[in-house]
Amino acid sequence: MAKIAAELWRALAQRQKDGLPGQTTPRVIARGEGWSVADVVCTCGPQDDPYEERHNQDTIAIVQAGGFEYRSTAGRGLMTAGSLMLGSHGQSFECAHRHGDGDRCVSFWYAPDYFERLAADAGAGRADRRFKVASMPALRQLSPLVAQAAVGVRRVADVPWEELAVTLAVRTVNLASGVSARRGLPLHAEARVARAIRTIDHRLDASLSLGRLAREAGLSPYHFLRTFKSLAGVTPHQYVLRARLREAASRLATGGAKVVDVALESGFGDVSNFNRAFRAEFGESPLAWRRSTRWT
């Protein structure tokens, strides 16, 4: 995950050096009958005006780094690392970066008939085969899939993309049917918390208490906690923990470092706490995860 973010920051630095407007660059990394996957890097920022777009296919985009504001006919959401942007074919949408520059996503695109068949096979009624919400927070049920997609950006040939695309679609459809649309929040509070989330993403190895984050955002701890959970779908503690675990999962899958070193470098104070948290999040131990993600 750190390498994925670092590549985004380099792209943003190059855009600034060249004095060019932001742009979205998709790189298709896998495709099959009825589905495709792309590594999408966006270098837009507050200086770029958002514009209306349209989903030509059913879309599930996993945010891997950065963040943005997303609005569609299904609702709106602040997209942060680990969250899912959802779109049904034919929906109009708009992305904006009022609170910071750039994002990087792994986008899964599905042909409408293919996606509808997957949703039906998952047991979704006809009304639930189109997304009624704009986004999904970084939920534990999605963590293994989010981490596998991150690994795939670095090792494209090693990931069973079709299996991942099918599993992601089915799980997202089932989870999305139980998610409520987000209520509107005061813009000043939303902006402050959005900046705090970017701060967290850049300082995952630091001590990030609720009080400290609230002070830096200029909000009381209560209002910060309430606004953060409404925007991100999880508490600050859960967000930091899951971000650290995704980073650790990526390091375990792509490198050969010892588990204890991965734990410490990912911001955990001791390996026993790391092992418990990792197993709770991914359903297996760090070593078992490393073995299971060595697909070849």
Language-model features and meaning:
Residues 4-8, 121-182, 198:
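Amphipathic alpha-helical segments enriched in hydrophobic/aromatic residues interleaved with Lys/Arg
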Residues 22-127:
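N-terminal regulatory/effector-sensing and dimerization cores
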Residues 45, 177-184, 230-232:
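Short, Lys/Arg-enriched N-terminal segment that forms or immediately precedes the first helix
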Residues 63, 200-203, 252:
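Short helix-to-turn junction characteristic of helix-turn-helix DNA-binding domains
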Residues 153-157, 203, 207, 255, ...:
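Short coil/turn helix-boundary motifs
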Residues 171, 175, 195-202, 206-246, ...:
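Basic/polar phosphate-binding segments, predominantly the helix-turn-helix DNA-binding elements
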